[in-house]
Amino acid sequence: MRKLNFISGNKVTLLHCGADYFSKILSEIDLATHEIYLETYIFANDKTSALVKAALNRAAARGVKVRVIVDWVGTGDKHSDVLVREFTQAGVECRRFNPWFRRGLARTHRKICVIDSRVALVGGLNIIDDLVSDDGSGLVLEFPRWDFAVHIEGDLVAHIFLEIKTQWLRLGKMNLLTRFKLIRNLRQSARSSAPLAMQAALVVRDNLRNRATIQRAYLHALGLARKRAILATPYFAPGGKFRRALISAANRGVDVTLLIGVGQFSLQDAVTNSFYPKLFAHGIKIVEYQKTQLHAKVAVIDHEWATVGSSNFDGLSLFVNQEANIVIRNQAFADALTTYLEQGIAEGHPVDPKEYANQAWYRRIWYGIAYFVYRGLMRIATLGSYT
């Protein structure tokens, strides 16, 4: 998947925060008749995750093949081990991604669920209550975590199913030749049918054929931007190519706005702040979202290109971890997402370039040190790919 493969014949519905997402995923799991694949970074131990777990167990009890992938770091060593045992007892197959870093540094940061090859859900939401902080602190949030996912029906589902089943096979113990044959057969089975209005593409990042696919999707869209680009992310620390693409768009007269989550990790906030002066110098607007945890990884460009997914705009997501985004070319969908983004901007705090320039000298030094440390760590983790 080295370039975007837009598939026609889809209905893509935007889901906002946990209220929309968990209601939809639970109802779809209860409708499952054949098989369910679920991949997530965090599968927490709380009331919301218990509901999902119970629904998966019920599905297995009625004969549905249920397969779950959880990340070893995101879910935790002890809890993921407990999940594997409890799921196995209930007839659910569960695999942990990259325990003890046996496959290198990469984590699966993807959030994908495919049910009966009929519907798929892809986005930024983990299996965790969205009123509980996702950093392990147990902090109760005043407002639900701000995040998005999409519910997909149509031809693209076959391609998403191919991706998650291939991931499952990669984590198995079968020999390389058998695995290759199964994956090849799956790829041949993913076909498109009748064209409909809504076009969408699955864009993944891995450390095989798709090392820069998500970044290239953003660079291409920003390169074609004419009027407006709104991008939201909890962590902003992209490489030089991404930053230059934002600046180039702004220099062409594109109205570029970044909606950035702050307040969760002080080091990450400092790294993000280190980029502000150059962005301000080219007219890019920055809004910090502080109402609750911003976890959304979404963007809209020119009211016709939109993306929702798991990939942050930082070194780990763009250069190390496994990620999954959906890109949609549809004005109605883009406008719906724009409405939410404009609401987030209205609720956020616009950073004034003049006020920022008047910050104390020691803060600016701290931002520079934070970036120097972050850049060094990312260059090691990415073998020099992060610039």
Pin down the residues of each PLM region.
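Charged, low-complexity intrinsically disordered terminal segments
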Residues: M1-T387
